[in-house]
Swiss-Prot record:
It comes from Caenorhabditis elegans. PANTHER family: RRNA PROCESSING PROTEIN EBNA1-BINDING PROTEIN-RELATED, RRNA-PROCESSING PROTEIN EBP2-RELATED. Residues 23-37, 46-59 have a biased composition (Acidic residues). This is Probable rRNA-processing protein EBP2 homolog. The keyword Cell inner membrane does not apply. GO terms for cellular component: nuclear periphery; nucleolus; preribosome, large subunit precursor. One of its GO terms (biological process) is rRNA processing. Residues 1-10 have a biased composition (Basic residues). Residues 206-245 form a coiled coil. Transmembrane segments: none annotated. Residues 1-59, 245-340 are annotated as: Disordered. InterPro entries: Ebp2 (IPR008610). It holds the Pfam family Ebp2. It is found in: Nucleus, Nucleolus.
Amino acid sequence: MVRKMNKLAKRLASTSKSRQPEPESDSDGSEFDFDNAIEEKPMEAMDIEEVESDGDDDERELQAAFAAGLLKDGLNIQVAKKRPIINKSAEMKEKLAEITKDLPWVETLEVVTPHSEMDKKVENDDFQRELNFYKQAEKAVQIAYPRLLNLGIKVLRPTDYYAEMAKSDTHMQKVRKRLLGIQEMKERQEAFRRIREEKKFAVKVQKEVLAAKNTEKKNLAEAVKKHKKGMKQQLEDMLNNVKRHGLDQDDDAPTGAFGDRLGGRGGAGRGGAGRGGSMRNAGELKRKLKSDKFGYGGKKKGMKRNNKESFNDLFGAPRGGFGGRGRGGGRGGRGGRGRR
């Protein structure tokens, strides 16, 4: 039936295409291209009659099928029939009785537990359903365990039981070697990580120590600077006090060449430039003493060598003559180059 319907549809489509009118010429009056035109052969009268007769037969068949209720309104497609469910319980029980063997209970270990019904809520809950399975297995063990003990069958494993390994010793040695290698690699990585952390900690401690040292050095420099500033201020205060109050140089000044020039042991007077008198006067006195002893210019012929008289003159000279501190004298300058 379906093949006839498809065949009828193809024939109707071919006849509709053959009966289409030829296209008219363009409105602008252009000529038709006869060279490129496709020549169409007219259908013969016999072919048309065959198509019409076949179409009438197919239509009659479709009408008869529709009247018999084989066709429905709308799109008609062939629907495969479903295979009926086969449930031959009687035959299955007979076959079960044939294959059933009469074996002792030890060979089968069949245990029937009390039936426990499960509602829809428990069936849809995976956890509750698995829990019911566990309880059912537990009840089966409680039933089978005493029966096995009564039959004299050992159930529990002895303490000295040695089970043979499924894998050989060679394979287990390889596994052990592999595990030891993995453990050694982990220990090595842990050691490297610990060394890196120790290096980071050492660098951190070194930076902290260096920062503390720099801070201490800075604080010490500031303290020294403040101390120097205080000492300088204290020295300036002492000099100002000496200049302000002064000393009586005329009463304590000794007589003689050294006393007249340098102020004697009393130190510098009011017009002095430092300890022991003026730097200018000390230089002139030193130059005069050398000139008196060694002469003026020219070759001295070893006259600068020390002798008994010069030794005695050096240590016998008055101590306060070259700018030394006099009794009651104030603080003066550094003195000449010989003093230093």
